């Protein structure tokens, strides 16, 4: 009996202590957490009254001002830059790698890291003020190579996006419990031509999980004259393979955004905002233009090239496009560029494939055997009279960007003449 009373008394004391701790936490939250509304003055001519507590990027997003963010607010892409002229506190260590000392002195911050805790005066690029968000409808979502989708969405009726070729859009990725590659991916949309690779590498065994909403950025492959159907090229980000000779996948999460997009079907709805970015052609310089790309980096380069030719009918500038792929079956939109070569004598398309390709040989497709940077060097620039006088537009995997920029630097090409859209 005595032991029972002691146990009950102990439980009672424990519950009282827990209750007191909860009360203390609630009181502390009330007095220490930001509460009430504050004012944010934007570009000196607009003020919004907003609740405290969220990041500046989230707060602006909720008020129709969409800062670019390719990483979903993780401080890794460094794109959500904004000047915080008053308020905001000290810059965080997570932000400093994205800015020069002069930019830090000029009060530049990352919107995803700056918390709204009081009145602010900020300055955002005027281009951001023109960004809109829409609920779009998926029109098609078909593979154009083994692991890349041509993802097309339609803007709502009557809506239009004004953009410069080379811009990108952002897709909202909702939280989801599980996307099962085998059950949730439409195998007909992957296509008979490519599904063998998925089975070979056991990719349908993968699953994806996303505990919280985020956003991802994708360059647009369409050019303005193609209307209000937005085309993105999206590569599936699978879990990395184990090092050989091991078989299987590493214990690393799959790509939450690409998994979501690959699961979408015609008729589905998706939230998209845009346009973003400054990877745009120089329309007036008169210089020779050279585009270099690989993989899903095709998207903004196609948009720029099609606009320069089909829309602007540029015939007074030399135009060259170098595109690299592992094999002919992994290259896409090729017909567009073969047709341009016929229509525009000043446009030249150079396809490079990593190794000898029997399929390309059987079809009589002209290609360079080797990597894109070697193709540029061996077939064109090594005999070019003045490579430093050309403009270069690059988009593709980081290794491609690095090897090409290193090579161009060795030729004496100024950094100002090299524009690129780098992605991982």
Which sequence ranges carry the predicted segments?
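Ferredoxin-reductase
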Residues: 139-266, 352-356
């Amino acid at each position: 009996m005595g032991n029972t009373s002691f146990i009950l008394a102990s439980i009672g004391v424990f519950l009282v202590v827990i209750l007191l701790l909860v009360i203390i936490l609630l009181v502390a939250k009330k007095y220490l957490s930001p509460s009430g509304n504050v004012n944010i003055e934007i570009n000196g001519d607009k003020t919004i009254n907003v609740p405290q507590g969220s990041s500046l990027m989230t707060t602006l997003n909720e008020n129709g001002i969409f800062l670019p963010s390719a990483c979903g607010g993780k401080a890794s892409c460094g794109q959500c830059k904004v000047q915080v002229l008053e308020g905001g506190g000290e810059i965080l260590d997570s932000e400093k790698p994205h800015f020069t000392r002069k930019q830090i002195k000029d009060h530049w911050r990352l919107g995803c890291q700056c918390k709204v805790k009081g009145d602010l005066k900020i300055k955002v690029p005027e281009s951001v003020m023109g960004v809109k968000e829409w609920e779009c409808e998926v029109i098609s979502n078909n593979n154009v190579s083994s692991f890349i989708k041509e993802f097309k969405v339609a803007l709502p009726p009557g809506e239009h996006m004004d953009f410069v070729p080379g811009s990108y859009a952002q897709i909202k990725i909702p939280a989801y419990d599980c996307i099962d590659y085998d059950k949730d991916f439409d195998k007909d949309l992957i296509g008979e031509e490519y599904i063998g690779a998925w089975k070979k590498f056991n990719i349908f065994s993968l699953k994806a999980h996303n505990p919280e909403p985020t956003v991802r950025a994708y360059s647009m492959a369409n050019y303005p004259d193609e209307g209000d159907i937005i085309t993105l090229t999206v590569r599936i980000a699978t879990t990395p393979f184990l090092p050989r000779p091991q078989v299987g996948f590493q214990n690393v999460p799959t790509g939450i955004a690409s998994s979501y997009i690959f699961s979408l079907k015609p008729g589905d709805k998706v939230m998209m905002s845009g346009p973003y970015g400054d990877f745009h052609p120089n329309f007036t310089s008169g210089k020779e233009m050279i585009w270099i790309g690989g993989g899903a980096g095709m998207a903004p380069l196609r948009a720029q090239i099609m606009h320069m030719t089909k829309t602007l009918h540029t015939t007074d500038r030399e135009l060259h496009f170098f595109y690299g792929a592992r094999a002919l079956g992994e290259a896409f939109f090729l017909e567009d560029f073969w047709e341009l070569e016929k229509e525009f004598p000043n446009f030249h398309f150079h396809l490079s494939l990593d190794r000898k390709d029997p399929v390309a040989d059987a079809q009589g497709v002209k290609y360079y055997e080797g990597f894109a940077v070697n193709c540029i060097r061996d077939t064109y620039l090594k005999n070019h009279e003045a490579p430093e006088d050309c403009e270069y537009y690059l988009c593709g995997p980081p290794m491609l960007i690095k090897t090409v920029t290193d090579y161009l630097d060795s030729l004496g090409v100024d950094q100002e003449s090299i524009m690129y859209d780098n992605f991982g």
